[in-house]
Amino acid sequence: MDTSSLMEQILSRDNLNAAYLQVVRNKGAAGVDGMTVEELGAYLSENGEIIREQLRTRKYKPQPVRRVEIPKPDGGKRNLGVPTVVDRFVQQAVAQVLTPIFEEQFHDHSYGFRPNRCAQQAVLKALEMMNDGHSWIVDIDLAKFFDTVDHDKLMTIFGRTIKDGDVISVVRKFLVSGVMIDDEYEDTVVGTPQGGLCRYPHNPPYVEFYVMPS
């Protein structure tokens, strides 16, 4: 598949409309600018063409994510990054075009945070494997994985499939957009925020490209 001219697909009216509707369905909290999902439609009506042109000319600049801590089952804290609703809209538009491309590379028995797949399917597959005589289950958690993702390595993997420089540029900009912690800005030179684009799994799809290809 030719992936050298994906930005025009991302900027198509149909794709942008679908992205807007998905962000509204996802709801979620406001980012650092305080804009709510309910305010997004009016904002895009006034500024949508400006955003499209900024993306087309590589001038779009994502805002920092807002740091939020949520409790983990083991008693610790998990850091989430909440993007602005406008950034979520752009991320969603990008993801809708990229996801079908990368889905073809993922392992058939990987069920986490993928379209048309769910935990119940994973359980059924595990039962099938147990019935085939497999008796071991290994539970592995990669400690602080999202906090330590190497940007250059991630973008190298990403670039093996995606050849559109405009798309590569905007994805990297989201990686280095920074984070606001108690009104203090911090650079993000490593790692990727959990939250935003796919708030239900708390991991942007470009991280799946890093860990999930077969």
PLM feature spans:
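N-terminal alpha-helical targeting/anchoring segments
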Residues: 1-47
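Amphipathic alpha-helical blocks
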Residues: 39-61
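Short, compositionally biased low-complexity segments
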Residues: 11-28, 65-67, 96-101, 131, ...
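Short helix/loop capping segments that flank catalytic or ligand/cofactor-binding pockets
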Residues: 19, 90-91, 147-149
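Electropositive, glycine- and tryptophan-enriched low-complexity nucleic-acid-binding patches
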Residues: 91-109
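Duplex nucleic acid-engaging cores and interfaces of nucleic-acid transaction enzymes
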Residues: 86, 90, 127
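Conserved polymerase palm-domain catalytic core
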Residues: 54-69, 73, 105-117, 121-214
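Conserved phosphate-binding loops in nucleotide/dinucleotide-binding enzymes
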Residues: 79-84
